[in-house]
Swiss-Prot record:
Heme 1 (or BL or b562) is low-potential and absorbs at about 562 nm, and heme 2 (or BH or b566) is high-potential and absorbs at about 566 nm. The lineage of its organism: Eukaryota, Metazoa, Chordata, Craniata, Vertebrata. This is Cytochrome b. A ubiquinone binds at H201. One of its GO terms (cellular component) is mitochondrial inner membrane. It comes from the Eukaryota. InterPro entries: Cyt_b/b6_C (IPR005798), Cyt_b/b6_C_sf (IPR036150), Cyt_b/b6_N (IPR005797), Cytb/b6-like_sf (IPR027387), Cytochrome_b (IPR030689), Cytochrome_b_C_euk/bac (IPR048260), Cytochrome_b_N_euk/bac (IPR048259), Di-haem_cyt_TM (IPR016174). Belongs to the cytochrome b family.
């Protein structure tokens, strides 16, 4: 088996990626989330495939086909709730994975980091078009509001919106194409994830100290396969608890009502994992400005390698930057809360302050903190 593992063309790729891969000996549990994201992706593709077998992408039957899946298909309710809550789990792992990358300076692997940002955009697009498919009230109005944002683009905005809709409003053509996008995008994400891994294995993993660890690397198997397996067990326990006991906790009650274009919900909002970006969008009174802020709230991550001013890679020994990092995390929690609140005082001003703080920490305070810490090293 050992000979085949190292000589067979296909097995050799697997061997270099998951078995004999030289890995830093000191990487912590925060490095588990890459493999957990892979698990989430496989889970979403499998459950989505079974849901697609019973789904019809027609405005008249989409809602009832989802209800039919829950009521009449064997374990359809379980598959549907696993898929819906799997998206939340996916984004929890994704945000922790990005947070770990920021904390330990992994963004200095530029190619890996930029492909990661592209993966984030694609995952957000997949989740958005997927949210439209059940054709409930929030699905319909969420699709209408978010796609309408493109009309803020000068000159071509309105034409672009109508082109995406396939008509003059969100209708059958929109639903059909969103289903097509939702089906194909996860496979594109899978391919990109492999490229992400390819670039990571070119440089090797970073570690909590942020220093080279070539002299002391250990094989990935059995050390980190065992460690990842523990993460998988913990994640699946949390996930199945959520699915079995609180399946609708993270959803919107409005989505249990069929879409009605004549009745607008009192408060239109996306799923919880988009609320921070939605709060940033709403904090700017100008439509085009809001859309630019929304896109830049994610794109700003691409600037991190160029804003790195510290002589140290990781935040492990940088107390000032650590304080700013956890302030940023707290700020994102506040933005998530604000995104779910109605547009009224005091939520408007809180959202605006939190949005300014979000960009200030990343673009101004963290680079300055890095320079101050460099000075402190000389003292």
């Amino acid at each position: 088996m050992t000979i085949m593992r190292k000589s067979h063309p296909l097995m050799k790729i697997v061997n270099h990626a998951f078995i004999d891969l030289p890995t830093p000996p000191n990487i912590s549990g925060w490095w588990n989330f890459g493999s957990l994201l892979g698990l989430c992706l496989i889970l979403q593709i499998l459950t989505g495939l079974f849901l697609a077998m019973h789904y019809t992408s027609d405005t008249l039957t989409a809602f009832s086909s989802v209800m039919h899946t829950c009521r009449d298909v064997n374990y359809g309710w379980l598959i549907r709730h696993m898929h819906a809550n799997g998206a939340s789990l996916f984004f929890i792992c994704l945000y922790i994975h990005i947070g770990r990358g920021i904390y330990y300076g992994s963004y200095l692997y530029k190619e890996t980091w930029n492909i990661g940002i592209l993966l984030l955009f694609l995952t957000m697009a997949t989740a958005f078009v997927g949210y439209v498919l059940p054709w409930g009230q929030m699905s319909f109005w969420g699709a209408t509001v978010i796609t309408n944002l493109l009309s803020a683009i000068p000159y071509i905005g309105q034409d672009l919106v109508e082109w995406i809709w396939g008509g003059f409003s969100v209708d059958k053509a929109t639903l059909t194409r969103f289903f097509a996008f939702h089906f194909i995008l996860p496979f594109i994400i899978t391919a990109l994830a492999m490229v992400h891994l390819l670039f990571l294995h070119e440089t090797g993993s970073n570690n909590p100290l942020g220093i080279p660890s070539d002299s002391g690397k250990v094989p990935f198997h059995p050390y980190y396969t065992t460690k990842d397996f523990l993460g998988v067990i913990l994640l699946l326990t949390l996930f199945m608890t959520l699915v079995m006991f609180f399946p609708d906790k993270l959803g919107d009650p409005d989505n249990y009502m069929p879409a009605n274009p004549l009745n607008t919900p009192p408060h239109i909002k996306p799923e919880w994992y988009f609320l921070f970006a939605y709060a940033i969008l709403r904090s700017i009174p100008n439509k085009l400005g809001g859309v630019c802020a929304l896109v830049f709230s994610i794109l700003v991550l691409a600037l991190l390698p160029y804003l790195h001013t510290s002589k140290q890679r990781s935040l492990s020994f940088r107390p000032l930057s650590q304080t700013l990092f956890w302030t940023l995390v707290s700020d994102l929690v506040i933005l998530t809360w604000i995104g779910g609140q109605p547009v009224e005082s005091p939520y408007i001003i809180i959202g605006q302050v939190a949005s300014i703080l979000y960009f200030s920490i990343i673009l101004v305070f963290m680079p300055i903190a890095g320079l101050i810490e460099n000075k402190m090293l000389k003292w």
